[in-house]
Every structure is written in C-alpha cells, then in structure tokens.
Amino acid sequence: MFDGMTAETLARMQFAFTVSFHIIFPAFSIGVASYLAVLNGLWLRTRDDTYLTLFNYWKKIFAVAFGMGVVSGIVMSYQFGTNWSVFSDKTGPVLGPLMAYEVLSAFFLEAGFLGIMLFGRERVGDKLHMFATAMVAFGTLMSATWILSVNSWMQTPAGYSINELGQFVPEDWWQIVFNPSFPYRLVHMVLAAYLTTALVVGGVGGLHLLRNRKDAPARRMFSMAMWMLIVVAPLQILAGDFHGINTLEHQPAKVMAMEGHYDSHPDGAPLILFGIPNPDEKRIDYAVQIPQVSSLILKHAWGAPLDGLDTIPDEDEPPVAIIFWSFRVMVGLGFAMLGLGAWAAWQRYRGRLYDTQLLHRAAIVMGPTGFVAVLAGWITTEVGRQPFTVYGLLRTSDSLAPVAAPAVAASLLAFIMVYFFIFGAGTFYLLRMMNAPTSKPDPELKEGPIRTAGITPTMQSDPDLIPGE
C-alpha cells in the first residue's frame, strides 16, 4: 500500500491524517462553548425556557465533541517524540513552554469547570453555573490562543537565537508569543470556529424546522445561527484579506502558490479564478482570470507589481497544486456562507424565515461545509509552509527522526483503522444526538376516563364515557 514511499513522506502523511481528524473537533468545541455561554446568559436574563432547552440540548453534543478532541490531540504529541524527534529537540526550548502553558492554563481551566457546567446546575446555583460555563468557553479560546501562537511561530519565527547545538533558544517571549502572523491567524481561526458552529446549528435547526416549523427551540436556534452567519461571514472575509497581506509580507512563496503566480507581474497581476496548475511547465493551464485584481486585493493598488514563483529557488517552492485548490475551496465556501446568511436575512425581512423550506434544506446542505473550509484553510497554511517546519530556518527533511519507513507505514495503517472505527462511531453518535428532538414530547393521553390513584371513579362530563350507556 505504501511501497516506494520514504519515511519522511509517510511521517508527513501520518501527521496530516491525525491533525486533520483533530482540528475539526476543537474548531467545533470553541464555537459550541461560546454558544452555550450565550444561551445560559440569555436564559438567566430572560428566564425564557427555550434558551434553557437549547442549552441542555447542545451541552451533550459539546461534551462528546470535547472528549473526541482531547483524545485525538493526545496522539499528535506522541508523534513529536517518535517521528519528529529532531524537530522537538531543535524547537523544544521555544515551543515546549508554550505547549505546557496551554495544558497548565487552558486545559486545566476547561477540565476544572466542565463537570460543573454539565452536571452542576441543580447543585451550585444559577450564577456559579453561568460562571463555570463562561470559564469553559474562555478556556477553549485560551487553548486556541496558545496552540495558534505555537503554529504562528513556526510560520513567522521571532524572538529567538540559535545556539551552538542548532537549537532555537528564547530571547524575547513577548515576540515569540505575539509573532508577526499570530494576531491575524488567531482572529481568522476563531471566526472560522464560530462560522463552523453557526452552520452546524443552522443545519440542525433547519432539519427540525422541516419536520415541524412550529418547533420553538428549532426556530430559535435557526434564527441565532443565521444572525451569526450574516455578521461573522463578512468579518471573516475581511480578516482573511488582512491575513493574506501579512502572509505576502512574511511568506511570499505561499501567497504566490495560492494565487497561482508562477511568473512575476511588474505591471499588475491578474486574479486567477480557476485553472489547472502545471508544475512541470511552471504555468496555470486553462486559466480563467480577471486582469489586475490580484494586485488590487494583495496590495490594494491597481497595477501594483507582484513577484512570482520565478523569484523563489526550486528547492524552496511549496507544492503549488495542493495550495492552489485548497485555497479556492476555502474562499469559495466562505462566500457561500455569506450567501446563505444574506438569503436568510432577506427571508427574515420578508417574515418567512421559518416558512422557506428551500432555505432550510440549503442550511442542512451547508451544515458540514464549515469543517471542510477549516480543513482547506489548514492545508493551505501548512502545505504552504513547505519545505520548512520553521519557515526559512529548519527544513522538514532535517526535522525527521531516524525512523524506518516500514515502521512509520505500520503505525500509519494502524492509525487509519483505529481512527475510522473510533471517531466514525463518535461522529455517528453525534449525528444521532443532533437528529433527536430538541425537547421531549409531552406524554400522550390515553383515550378514555382519567382516574385518580384511588378506587373511586372521577366525575365524567362526556356522555360517551358514562358506563352503561
């Protein structure tokens, strides 16, 4: 199955496989945790039981997703010590403390308050329960902050020196944590998590509205999700624009691959909408493009010059085809999310938000696209950094542990089988929970006389139920 592949290729495949499974759960957990905090706060403020019903509905889904995220994340840490021990040795003085801070602060905060949030409402009081819910939401955001700081440092390293052993040594922790790409990546990822959650909530709400458009919790969750889409989707597009400009400054080869610019454009670069990258001929075949627009987007100036991959040595060039397509999947889905939010806003204005079945079906179809967009975005980010693990300083080929290809292949095959079984079952269970009714139906009254617990029959007013007649 993996014949002819090197240990480096297999190790990269293994990490890509495990991190792809992992990222979808934290992305969902971040959004759902904040959603639960909002629901709990609204219930405390209004005492509207619809919010409490939604809180109880989504907290169970959050618990399962959170657990799957924790389990899938453990595996990746072991790979740093097995397949990528050289990387761990060289970057450990910088990245080790950051990852420890994530555990000591964010994860402990989440773990400490999670039980109170899930089971403590009747035991600790409403206000303390609200505090616990807010702390879980804050913990997920803090966890994202530390992990994205680590990843951003690998993309745009700062605040370090290199000792005689070739290790990165911290010199300025402020520069390390708040490295040049960190603020943009943090905002972009958190907004992606909120969009992902809004799409899932909207899809679930749309499903239940198709079954019963009078379902009050379904109406509320669908309305909240559509508000989130129309507000956050434009912000995400704007954040992506700023992130792209920052990436052009610090990682120009990545942006050149994203845009498909093999050649430099001294008089302005076109925006290539679609095409087929041809790495052998260094061109985009069958390109559909709009003149000058790439320069306008990246430099906010019509006709501004843009360098191409012809200015990058071949050995430093990232895999263009993968980045080219993953970037377009991410951007295309982003605009589709904006379109869904705008459609919902129009139907809300017309007073038909809960009556337009086509909109509800579209929300169901769009439900999983947030996860696809997150995966496409991370493929763009991580593959675009190649051939480096620490951009411009440490190559991927120099980060690998001295492991044999058959050993990596065996562990990769084991991961594939175990992951699809365990996380497939977990995902199936999550889908069943989302398919369940938003609230328990009232027990149906049986036909016939209603009697008390005693032996005396109750008075009946229905002549059809009077015995003997």
Label each region the model flagged.
Residues 1-469:
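Polytopic transmembrane helical bundles with strong interfacial aromatic enrichment
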